[in-house]
Amino acid sequence: RLVPITRDIAEAPDVRDFVERYRQTLERELDQPVGRAEVPLDGREREVRSRETNLGDFVTDVMRERLGADLALLNGGAIRGNRLLPEGPITRRDLRQFLPFGNVLVLVEVRGAALGLALERAVSAYPRPAGAFLQVSGLHFRFDPSRSPGERVLDVTVRGRPLDPARAYTVALPDFLARGGDGYAMFGAARVLVPAPHGPGLVETLLDAVERRRS
């Protein structure tokens, strides 16, 4: 039968002590340094939702390398914590505060034309900060914020070559974007090469990359 949990139930000392020991162990693990930042890493909310940042560059570079993709995209809204991580040690807590959602990496294949639409979506709210703004790796693009949304992207290059609307590109994404989240319906309709159940965790991938760079 169901037992209601109310304030009338006395605290069990043995359970309390067990939970406290576990909490202390977890706190020590979270505060364990896993690497070092040679420069401050910018995870401030306004910045990651309106412009390229070095934290966004690092995360998307790791995503692209991990899945061997042509490029990687991460919505700025996936980065939380709203802070500038100072130069110095990076802990597990730091990385989990920046990426708290438990996202899994997905590899999809999309045409260049769909990527163009995605980039238009990314800058549609600019200069207003928006969670849909994309941090990117493997591509560069310019846009004109004075033009109407949907017509702002001027040119795009993927690994130094102009974006080909007809070509298929492989893209590393968090599962949220792969499901069409934040208005990215073109990814929800994309061909999936590595689905979420088989993809690596985003924060685990980042932890591994930071630890490898330390060694």
Residue ranges and their predicted role:
Residues 1-215:
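Catalytic centers of hydrolytic enzymes
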